[in-house]
Each structure stands twice: as structure tokens, then as C-alpha cells.
């Protein structure tokens, strides 16, 4: 899951 700062999924928080 790709979550940019938790927007999609909170497992990867890419800031």
C-alpha cells in the first residue's frame, strides 16, 4: 500500500 502521509494507507507514510 502506498499512503502519501497516510492518505491512501497509513502503512507507508511518504512525506
Curated annotation (Swiss-Prot):
Q: What does this protein do?
A: Defense against chitin-containing fungal pathogens.
List the GO cellular component terms.
extracellular region
| Stated name of the protein | Endochitinase 1
The GO terms this record gives for MF are:
endochitinase activity
Entry's localization field: Secreted, Cell wall
Superkingdom field: Eukaryota
Q: What is its EC number?
A: 3.2.1.14
> Which organism is the protein's source?
Capsicum annuum var. annuum (Red pepper)
Q: Which reaction does it catalyse?
A: Random endo-hydrolysis of N-acetyl-beta-D-glucosaminide (1->4)-beta-linkages in chitin and chitodextrins
- Disulfide topology: none
Q: Which family does it belong to?
A: Belongs to the glycosyl hydrolase 19 family. Chitinase class I subfamily.
> Its Gene Ontology biological processes?
chitin catabolic process; defense response; polysaccharide catabolic process
Keywords carried by this UniProt record: Carbohydrate metabolism, Cell wall, Chitin degradation, Glycosidase, Hydrolase, Plant defense, Polysaccharide degradation, Secreted
Q: What is its main location?
A: secreted
Amino acid at each position: 500500500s502506498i499512503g502519501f502521509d497516510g492518505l491512501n494507507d497509513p502503512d507507508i507514510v511518504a512525506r
